């Protein structure tokens, strides 16, 4: 049977209300916002998508549909370095199947904090697609441009990952599985396969998805966990969970090379270096505050908090806006005794010794300014909802006051959030999964 079509000619799915309709009032139809068949099954579009790797889900049909829905004229595409090789192909597809022109944003994108809606708007874009990261910046917080996040879920040989864990750990072991957002689906599949023989947890550090970690944000694991297994390439994200759990054995499974390795981190050296930097800063009278301008890295709220603390202590300070922070740049400010960078905590942790003056994180600055206690386990909670203090982005003191909203849905009817266990990319509200009403 031919599907019903709305005024624009696209198919719609009508859901009949279960409750009686009041007499004298026109019935209300709820129309699911789904991809029309003429886009999802367009043979020309499917053929064009073959230039992209099959195991990378760039969600092209949904992107085309969202752009058409928004009647977008200029679409900005932002992606990390590892995905830029596909940017031109995606741009060509968008321009072929929509009336929009595309702009590929070439500035470096290190992570989810680098969402650059400000630049997209300055370029005249009215729609932006950010690839490869989760929705750290909510879609309702972007300015003047509609936002679509594409996680780029990557299919891997999950069975080999599961077999590798079975080979290396005895049955009954307590394991924590973590990853980046690209492999979260594979992580959940592995958990399902392993949970009969192992005590498997997929820890969550909200607002991140279950199992997802960032280079600056990772959960604290229960002491009963025997080992944490990271699914992904590289060490940057893995080191985050290692720093926040120094007593837990860490392993890495590279889904590309299929190599499984035990990983180590020099906690004592890191803590010594950071402690020395804090000690030097304790007696400083002239401070430099750096607000990162690479996308949304910088937090004005943290900046304001640091300024108020320095003012209360009678310390002088200078503000500096930088998209990237290099030692030679900071050497130009000889009068500054200590720097605090509100950008990426890992810059100080990983590269702090490369700078001639102490380069502190907001947390370390709070310790030096006698506001926070030094933690023997270094906190990796920069974007965590439950953090130690106002030197983190999502601390409760920085959240806007929200009016109480009457609950209209029963608890069991609540839509899955991307931070819920078992939620999929398609169910995430940041993907603009909404319902529209037609009279």
Swiss-Prot record:
[4Fe-4S] cluster binds at residues 113, 216, 344. The keyword Lyase does not apply. Transmembrane segments: none annotated. Binds 1 [4Fe-4S] cluster per subunit. The cluster is coordinated with 3 cysteines and an exchangeable S-adenosyl-L-methionine. Catalyzes the first step of diphthamide biosynthesis, a post-translational modification of histidine which occurs in elongation factor 2. Dph1 and dph2 transfer a 3-amino-3-carboxypropyl (ACP) group from S-adenosyl-L-methionine (SAM) to a histidine residue, the reaction is assisted by a reduction system comprising dph3 and a NADH-dependent reductase. Component of the 2-(3-amino-3-carboxypropyl)histidine synthase complex composed of dph1, dph2, dph3 and a NADH-dependent reductase. This is 2-(3-amino-3-carboxypropyl)histidine synthase subunit 1. It comes from Xenopus laevis. The lineage of its organism: Eukaryota, Metazoa, Chordata, Craniata, Vertebrata.
